[in-house]
Amino acid sequence: MKKRKFANAAVMLILLSVVGYAFFGSPVEMYRRGELRKAMAAVEDGEVTLNEIVPFAWDSVYSFGPYTTQEQMEEIMGISARRLEESPSEGMVQLVFVNGGQIVCGVCGYISKEGYSVSFDEKINFADNVVFRAKRDADGILWLTEPHD
């Protein structure tokens, strides 16, 4: 009887995990998004690189504009991106961090909710150590703009 209860509990736990993953995505990615949001919240006005900010390993980051389809993202990145979503409107941040050919963090959310916006053309490599201008607006939103040398 105890074995059956244990087996039922194990099956239920596995099912809940699968359903949770299907609806909410990877808990590791969720954790990384939260850590990235915290790191962005700590950035002060001035010059900064993503290498200094991003709190997890990455070798390239992609930025996609609104309405970019999953298929277009996959073609640009050259990898399968099953969990990526199209940004449904203007005013959203859409970043995909890749490490070793695997997506390690995807951000698709309203700038006002994420608390930051990062503006660059399509792709940045970690090795490039691109410098951004960091500026907070009156609402406390961090704007990382215009990479420059």
Locations of regions flagged by a protein language model:
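N-terminal export/targeting and maturation segments
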Residues: 3-9, 16-84
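Exposed boundary/loop context
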Residues: 10-13, 94
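Extracytoplasmic
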Residues: 56-58, 89-92, 127
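Short, low-complexity, polar/charged sequence segments that are solvent-exposed and flexible
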Residues: 80-84, 101, 115-116
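Short, structured surface segments that line ligand/substrate-binding pockets
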Residues: 85, 89-107
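A short acidic/small-residue loop/turn micro-motif
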Residues: 108-113
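C-terminal partner/receptor-binding element of secreted or periplasmic proteins
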Residues: 114-149
